[in-house]
């Protein structure tokens, strides 16, 4: 039985008075945090490619470095985004010269997901006397190459980040607001409620037809008919999920509204309302 249950998103949470003290001294990223994140990425890139430091610019980004860091956001995640100088990359890695900018980014991101992410799913930045990183807060750190981000001091502003700290240069590119947006247009809330009603309808239909399928003899006409309906519902759930998730990317394009854009609001509200989890349960059910 699939039912909508409240989810998690720090987007609507009350901000803290300070940035995460496990990561920052005041507004400055702690040197050991900066060094470790930088080395995790550059060591990986240097192992798989050549001369990474010459073509890479690295940022820490997202709500984890905002004043809403203490909210229950599900995973305690940190996003490390980087941009590259594609001309310099190709000079050092000529085997990729036949690929487009987007194809290179996709290739590197796929490698990161497979080879680096599993090793950075539990990262701790507190150092004890026995040389183990075992104290303090655990973080799930994910690394991304965004083809829209350039290898220059403010290159990440192309995707309108809510907050971005330049790890390479050790400075803020985009400081997070101390008082995030809380007054959203009624149209935003209306669309979010429509999404919730639609997901409720899909889950109710799925539960009813799936129950009928489970009581049918496998491969009987009744079973096959129920399976066909289930597949249609899964396709509808996938389409809705894709529209909400993919739509969020529009918020961070050059002509988007960034963190307060409707499409980001819609995604965050879908997470907070449990719609993302429910849709995935239907899709994978």
Label for each model-derived stretch:
Residues 2-75, 83-285:
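Catalytic core of pol beta-like nucleotidyltransferases
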């Amino acid at each position: 039985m699939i039912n909508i249950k409240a989810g998690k998103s720090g987007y609507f949470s009350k901000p803290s008075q300070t940035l995460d003290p496990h990561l920052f001294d005041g507004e400055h990223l702690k040197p050991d945090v900066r060094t470790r994140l930088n080395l995790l990425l550059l060591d990986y890139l240097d192992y798989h490619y050549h001369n990474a430091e010459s073509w890479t610019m690295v940022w820490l980004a997202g709500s984890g470095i905002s004043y809403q860091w203490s909210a229950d956001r599900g995973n305690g995640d940190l996003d490390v985004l980087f941009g590259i100088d594609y001309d310099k990359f190709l000079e050092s890695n000529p085997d990729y010269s036949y690929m487009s900018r987007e194809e290179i980014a996709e290739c590197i991101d796929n490698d990161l997901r497979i080879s680096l992410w599993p090793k950075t799913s539990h990262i701790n930045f507190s150092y004890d006397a026995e040389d183990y990183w075992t104290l303090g807060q655990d973080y799930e750190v994910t690394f991304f190459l965004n083809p829209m981000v350039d290898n220059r001091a403010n290159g990440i502003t192309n995707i309108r980040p809510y907050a971005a700290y330049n790890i390479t240069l050790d400075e803020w590119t985009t400081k997070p607001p101390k008082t995030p947006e809380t007054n959203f247009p009624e149209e935003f809330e209306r669309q979010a409620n429509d999404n919730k009603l639609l997901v409720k309808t899909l889950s109710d239909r799925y539960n009813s037809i799936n129950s009928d399928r489970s009581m049918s003899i496998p491969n009987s006409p009744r079973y096959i008919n129920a399976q066909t309906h289930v597949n249609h519902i899964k396709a509808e759930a996938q389409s809705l999920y894709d529209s909400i998730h993919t739509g969020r990317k529009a918020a961070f394009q050059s002509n988007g509204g960034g963190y307060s854009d409707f499409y980001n609001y819609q995604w965050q509200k879908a997470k907070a309302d449990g719609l993302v989890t429910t849709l995935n349960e239907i899709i994978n059910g």
